[in-house]
Amino acid sequence: MGQALRKLTAADYPVVVQEPRKKVLAVKGLVKAYKSQHRVLDNINFELHAGEFVAIIGRSGAGKSTLLHILNGTIPTSAGEIINYHENGDTQNIAALTTKQMRKWRAKCGMIFQDFCLVPRLDVITNVLLGRLSYTSTLKSFFKLFSEQDQARAIELLQWLNMLPHALQRAENLSGGQMQRVAICRAMMQNPKILLADEPVASLDPKNTTRIMNTLQKISENDIAVIVNLHSVDLVKDYCTRVIGIAHGRIIFDGPPSMLNDSIIQDIYSDESAELLH
């Protein structure tokens, strides 16, 4: 007779322990107000971890784009801190950086836009190479020659997004989807740890929308934190791992897309939420 079967226990199965994702950024008490004293952003608090794919949603004028530009350093804060966590454990308040220090920060915090922001008359590969200049002064940028390493990186990125055949084509002759792929390549030239995307698919057709969202998802899967400003809740649920809902300058929801029900969506997009916040 064969050997009696032994009852399997938990000890027979390998235990897979997932390491907590690295914290890359913490926003604390962020406020943005203009001369009218109107607070576009009011007491914004959240943490960001490597590999997260975070959607920012809300009505037009809720402060979504302003938040992304503040994180990138192109708009100053009125109050609060933006803490950058370095690999060695050191921290740095982005909101207090000098102009020179801010250029170095932008090398680690790439950004793409709805209108692509390419130089129309330059060819594709030169537009991508311009991503290497974000950390240098404007004057030095005009006289800096791109290294062979820079050129190899640009070619690698263009090949990754199937844009290498268009490398010598002027940017103005590309389609919207192609322009956004070039913009992503440019943002990735510095190997950023954070990628900000301000309405990256707002002007694209469904096919190119899917392509760009798939690309952003792949980027996040490579331990890069991605924050995207989106209008489509369906895209948020299909692609993102986390949602931050902003209404009238304040965060009223922060959680996984699975918790984003009709009631919460209505609160985020309804004018009635203003009465609850003020």
UniProtKB/Swiss-Prot annotation:
Enzyme Commission identifier(s): 7.3.2.2
Alphabetized Gene3D superfamilies for the sequence: P-loop containing nucleotide triphosphate hydrolases
Stretches assigned to the ABC transporter domain: 25-273
InterPro entries: AAA+_ATPase, ABC_transporter-like_ATP-bd, ABC_transporter-like_CS, ABC_transpr_PhnC, MetN_ABC_transporter-like, P-loop_NTPase
Keywords from the named record: ATP-binding, Cell inner membrane, Cell membrane, Membrane, Nucleotide-binding, Phosphonate transport, Translocase, Transport
Gene Ontology cellular component terms for the protein in this record: plasma membrane
Binding residues annotated for ATP, in chain numbering: 58-65
Localization, UniProt: Cell inner membrane
UniProt cross-references to SMART domains, sorted A to Z: AAA
EC class name: translocase
GO molecular function: ABC-type phosphonate transporter activity; ATP binding; ATP hydrolysis activity
Membrane-topology annotation of the record: Peripheral membrane protein
Source superkingdom: Bacteria
Record-linked SUPFAM superfamilies: P-loop containing nucleoside triphosphate hydrolases (SSF52540)
Catalytic activity: phosphonate(out) + ATP + H2O = phosphonate(in) + ADP + phosphate + H(+)
Subunit composition and interactions: The complex is composed of two ATP-binding proteins (PhnC), two transmembrane proteins (PhnE) and a solute-binding protein (PhnD).
Purpose: Part of the ABC transporter complex PhnCDE involved in phosphonates import. Responsible for energy coupling to the transport system.
Family label: Belongs to the ABC transporter superfamily. Phosphonates importer (TC 3.A.1.9.1) family.
Protein name: Phosphonates import ATP-binding protein PhnC
Naturally occurring in which organism (per UniProt): Yersinia pestis
